[in-house]
Amino acid sequence: MASCSRTWLLPGMAPQATAQTVPRPLQSLKVFAGLPHRRRVLFSGVSSRTRRGRIRSVKDDSLHFDPSKIEAPPYSSYFDSTSGQLEPASGARASIPGQEYWPEGTASRVRAARAPAPVGESAGTPSFGKKPGSRRKGYKEQVASATAGRGTETSGDEGESVVAIEASSDETLEETKDSLDEYVVYEMPKEENLSEYEMDKMMGRPHPFVDPQKAMSVGEPKSSEELWWNWRRKSEENEMWSRWQRRRPDVDTVFAKAMAETGQIKIFGDHPTRTEAALAKARRHLFKEERLEAEQRRLEEIGPIAYYSEWVEAYKNKDTSREAVQKHFEETGEDENTQLITMFQHQTAGEFRIMMGTDVRIQRDPLAMRMREDQIKQIWGGDPVYPTINYVHDPDEVADYRGPEFHEPTPEVVPYLMEHGIMITKEELYARLNEEMEDINQDITYLPEVRDPMATAVDIGEHSYNEDSDDDEEDADKVVAQPESLEDDEDDGDDAEDAEGKVSRNWSVLKTTGQAENPKEKSKKDQLSLKEAIADSENLTDFLMDFEEDE
């Protein structure tokens, strides 16, 4: 294009004659081959005014359009924070982000769009995979070599030659060598026989976490000592040195244990771990819905009277089955609603609060309604201002009260006494008394009638066995020894009296030494001095009692 003169471009000016004049009919259009964007039609000897007159003007109403009908973009430009400049929102100048910011699948589509056209021409019809050998790599290389190096040479303006050389197909093959296989096999899509679990998983329906067919069968639940997560290195001293070191349960742990007792969940051990309690807490609403559905089914099965009689103490021992309700209806004509109202008339206010809770509109959790008293205390017991029970604890925390700043909490008196066996309940007391009465009735077969009540009195040691006693005292001793000899055989009666006689009045000697004292014979006639009497007696009590007898 540099060979064109400037006068050529001005209107109404003809080009100057060149060295060789070409006649007008032989003048042809010149095209630069291989450079399509440089194509330019050159008119020789024709002015632009004549050419402008030859163009036919087309006036067609269909070409006109209403610019208001074109929907404008929501905004024409935006402030790009990356470049810090105003960028066009649409059009050719709109900035394209880098490949790392493209959405998923865009890179493969762009790569497929940039792929070169297939080299060569197809000689036959496709066989759809029946003859895979027809698409060998060598065949492609032959076709590529036949078409390689093909170029065209055309003459440009002013006698310049421009050569357009096609890119060799070897470079193209090198680019696509990785993605091409040796041959292509067309396969029909296989029909997938999905199981119920795979179908639920693919469709997004609720399904178990593990395929039930491939899941390993879990054995019997192990105790807390056998579970590996409860293993601890055994210390030399007992860890539970105080009964106050027991971990206080929190709400989630108690609820998880209650759900495990009712069979709604399964825990591996005696007490739920923090993980099991957290999993049960995460599915709290689902578990509650399941429990409410089970309660509704039970209500429909057994009837409302039998269902609500659980919270009416007066109706606990009464037959509330459907047959009994129907029989009562046939006898009295009262329908089920009337009988239900009658039953609720026997319900106390406390039972109504337990049954319905604080608000009759809220469906209460059946698990909380039927919790034992100790579980309720574990959750809702304690001080609401400084909670000691109903908060989440550290599982490895061991409270140590042995420091100077701490002391063991003062226990409640009644549970403490009952725990140590110092206090018993009334029922247990009556049971023990009944057992003792039965034992007495079995052992005592015969008791002689004693008219004198003093005959059965117990000797508390007023008289000494080592002194000469009166006849009345001897008779009293014989009478006292008689009930004791009745318990044994008749042959052992004398031995029992002798053994009883060996134990002297000096009980302190028997307590300290464990041996009975042999009685010392001393005459009452011999008068002892004060020092001798003190030395002769074993202790002060014996001395004083002997001194009183001497007087």
Curated annotation (Swiss-Prot):
It is found in: Plastid, Chloroplast. Disulfide bonds: none annotated. Residues 518-529 have a biased composition (Basic and acidic residues). Residues 505-516 have a biased composition (Polar residues). GO terms for molecular function: transcription regulator activator activity. Residues 1-47 form a transit peptide. One of its GO terms (cellular component) is plastid-encoded plastid RNA polymerase complex. Residues 467-476, 485-498 have a biased composition (Acidic residues). One of its GO terms (biological process) is response to blue light. Keywords: Chloroplast, Plastid, Transcription, Transcription regulation, Transit peptide. Residues 76-161, 463-529 are annotated as: Disordered. Residues 109-119 have a biased composition (Low complexity). Required for the activity of the plastid-encoded RNA polymerase (PEP) and full expression of genes transcribed by PEP. Required for the proper build-up and formation of the PEP-complex. Binds single-stranded (ss) DNA and RNA, but not double-stranded (ds) DNA. Component of the plastid-encoded plastid RNA polymerase (PEP) complex. This is Protein PLASTID TRANSCRIPTIONALLY ACTIVE 12, chloroplastic. The lineage of its organism: Eukaryota, Viridiplantae, Streptophyta, Embryophyta, Tracheophyta.
